[in-house]
Regions:
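Basic side chains
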Residues: 6-7, 11, 154
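Sec-dependent signal peptide hydrophobic core
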Residues: 13-17
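Mature-region segments of soluble proteins
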Residues: 2, 45-46, 56-63, 74-244
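C-terminal segment of N-terminal export signals and the immediately downstream linker at the start
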Residues: 3-8, 20-63
Length: 244
């Protein structure tokens, strides 16, 4: 996937992804309208130690993030935007365990619209696929882990996973690529409280206003650019409650 195509894919799926993520929000208490220093948002995901990935896995996922969401002069890439942090926290939680979904046999291959038909959880898929991808990269003439390969070589591997021409041991490379692309998109466009979309960079890129609760002053103002910065579940810097 070229940088231009990747950006087009991200923008084209943005509106659906900003409202449907794998994460489940905590309860947000308080009354509307919100006032500065009066909110009570759920706890934010903070970057730091990894909850699911090993350090080697995290380095690989961050490298993958910067190839799927490459940085440019306007917007940070997937690594800086926190996509790997988002995926890490998701895999460590209910999403990683497929919690709440029916995952009992028999497993019959269905249509793409029916979703995964397997007992393999997202956490298992990532753990096994990342290990297989590492073996594939180290066994190639380069002999290096994915994170240390040149960007051109990284793109070749991703293109091979997408097309099915790169085969990973014991896992379906195409299935992993589809899951990775979906999760990267969600991490890039989800509310920053879940670890990705750091500083609301993706929302600013597409002009998405976020979780503002009142647009009454703008309902009748057609073809005007909305001038206010986006707002997340936790508010924005000047809305953040002061710590006593």
């Amino acid at each position: 996937m070229s940088g231009v195509r990747r950006r087009d894919v991200l923008k084209g799926t943005a509106l659906a992804l900003v409202t449907t993520t794998a994460a489940r929000a905590g309860v947000v208490a308080g009354q509307l309208p919100w006032r500065p220093d009066a909110g009570s948002p759920p706890a934010e995901v903070s970057a730091g130690s990894w909850s699911f990935f090993t350090p080697a896995e995290a380095a690989m996922v961050e490298a993958l993030a910067d190839r799927i969401v490459p940085p440019d002069e306007h917007t940070p890439g997937g690594k800086e935007a926190g996509c790997a942090v988002f995926i890490d926290r998701q895999l460590a939680g209910p999403y990683g365990r497929f919690e709440g979904l029916y995952t009992r046999p028999p497993f019959i291959k269905g249509s793409k619209q029916q979703g995964p038909q397997s007992a393999q959880t997202p956490a298992d898929l990532y753990r096994q696929s990342l290990a297989a991808l590492d073996r594939h990269c180290r066994g190639a003439p380069d002999g290096k882990p994915f994170a240390q390969l040149a960007a051109v070589r990284q793109d070749e591997i991703l293109q091979g996973l997408e097309s099915g021409t790169v085969h990973l041991e014991s896992v379906e490379g195409n299935m992993f690529f589809e899951a990775l692309l979906k999760d990267m998109q969600q991490g890039f466009f989800a509310d920053p409280i879940y670890g990705g979309n750091r500083d609301m960079c993706a929302w600013k890129m597409i002009g998405f206003p976020g979780t503002r609760y009142d647009y009454r002053d703008w309902v009748s103002r057609h073809n005007e650019r909305y001038p206010y910065p986006p707002v997340g579940i936790a508010g924005r810097p000047d809305w953040t409650p002061k710590k006593s």
